[in-house]
Structure formats: structure tokens, C-alpha cells
Amino acid sequence: MILTYKEILDKKLSINSYLWPNEFDPYEFIKTIVKAEIKNIGLHTEFIERFGINKLKQELTLNKINVTSLNSIGYFTDPKYFNENNKILSYAKILKPEYVCVISGGIKGGPNPLSKLYTCNKSVLNISQIRKDSSLKIKELFEKASSLNVNLGLEPIGSWEILKKGHFNSISSCLKFLKNNNHKLIIDLYHSFSDDDLDLFLKNSKKLGLLQFSNINFDKDFRPSGRRNINVIREENDLDITRYLKYIFNRKDNTKVEFEIFPHDLKGNDPKKIIMNLKDNILKLFI
């Protein structure tokens, strides 16, 4: 039986809790996605802790909501964030996400703000040595997660964020870690839209775990500077979202597509309305 795009979207669409502002009641986020008939969710640690992990697990089970991603672990260059990995893996044992997102961390530490535990040689950017050191830590983390039956999704980070967020910046640089294990890549269009390997990887690779998507804002110097909602009316420099979603929709596996924007991307827009209109806005792209 051939499924329609609507039927596929009903199965595959997820939305990440990063969108939900901290000052909003986290329960309202769950209530809104249930009302919008979205069956999958991505979670981040601050949301989990505001909700309470046991209460959140009950709500997800009650409403039959699948967890596509738990965000994030790794951050191998900054001890403060790196030391939280065990806590987040313990959350994964309870919430059972399809993947726990792994982000390598900035050459200068991070994510922002830098912690007081972070130190570096400020006179030189020793990128090759930091990548070498992190490679060992990634392998150790993969082995630990495998022993816990937790699947990880390593995320390539756009090279323009190498100093503050991630120092493995391409699909090819991340794939080398995925041999002989069940871990995969999480592809975020915001970070990988210009990757040479993107199209073929999304179409065919068995190492794709999840596609995170949104539109992109560019600053006056044409650098990525934030995320945008899915527009019905095309604007200048929109990504060809339809193309990338079709790649996932045409796959024979159960790979999900996860909408991800952040509170600072809302620009005064009501997150509830964004959630309620998301399915329709995506489907209108295919008309």
C-alpha cells in the first residue's frame, strides 16, 4: 500500500522541546503536541528537569508519545558539560529515546557560556590535536552507551560554529566513528545544508538516525544566524525543505523528521500556533 504524504508525516513528524520557552509551563507543551496529533517528541535536559523525569515518563506513556532524541551529550572540550554525560545517559535509560544526540563541543569550549572549568592555550587553535583527543573520548562514549543499550546519534556541526559548538564539521568526518556499532548520525539541516554528501546520505545511508529540520536565517554577511519556522509563502534564501523531507519519506525504514527551533527564533510568534499549524504548513510545501 502506498501511503500519502499526510500519512507518512503522521508517523514520522517529531518536534523538539527546545522550541518551548523556559517561562512556559512544560506540561502545556505536551498538551499542545497531543492536540496537534504529533506522535513523536525530541527532548532536552532543561525541559526534562523542569517537568520532572518520572512525571514526564508517565505523560509520554499515557499519551503514547515516542521520543526521537534526547539532547545532548558529548561536549568533549569543556569538563563542566562533559561531566554531565552520565546523568543524561541515566535519563535515556528511563525515557528510551531512539537516539541521544552527541555534540563534540567547541574548540574554545562550550556550548556558551563557557564554564569556569574550561582551559585552553589561547595563543593557538590546535584543531588537529583537539580532534585527536576527542576521537578517543567519542569511542569511549560509544562503548559505554552500547553497554547500556542506548543508541547515540553523532551530529556534524557547521564549521562556522567550530569555536563554540562542534569540531567535527562534516558528515564524512563523523561517519568514521560509526563502524562496527549501532550508533548513527543525527543530521541537522541548519548545520549540514551545505555538506557535499548531504543528498546521497539522506537518500541511502543506513547510518542516518534522524533528520532535524527548519528554515534558516542568514545575517547581513550571509552567515547562518538562527532558525525559522516552515513558511507557506517562500522567502528569500529558504532551504528546499520539500526535497530533504521527500528523501526521508521515500526511505523504507522508520527514520523520523524532527522540527527544531529555539525560543530566540520565535521572534514574538506564539509557539502553540507554530505547533498547531506545523503539519499543515509542511504539507502545503508539497502542493
Across the structure, where does each feature detected by a protein language model lie?
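Short acidic/polar active-site loop segments enriched in Thr and Asp
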Residues: K39, E98, G209, N254-T255
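Gly/Pro-rich active-site loop or hairpin
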Residues: E23, I30, P79, L114, ...
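N-terminal pre-domain/capping segments
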Residues: M1-Y99, S128-Q129, S146, N181-K184, ...
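Structured helix-beta-strand junction loops
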Residues: N63, L148, N181, N204-K207, ...
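Catalytic-core regions built around general acid/base machinery
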Residues: G52-N63, L136-A145, L200-F201, R243-I248
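Active-site acidic/histidine proton-transfer and metal-coordination neighborhood
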Residues: L3-E7, T77-K184, S194, K246, ...
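Active-site-proximal loop/turn and secondary-structure-junction residues that shape catalytic pockets
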Residues: L19-P21, T45-E49, I73-F76, S104-K108, ...
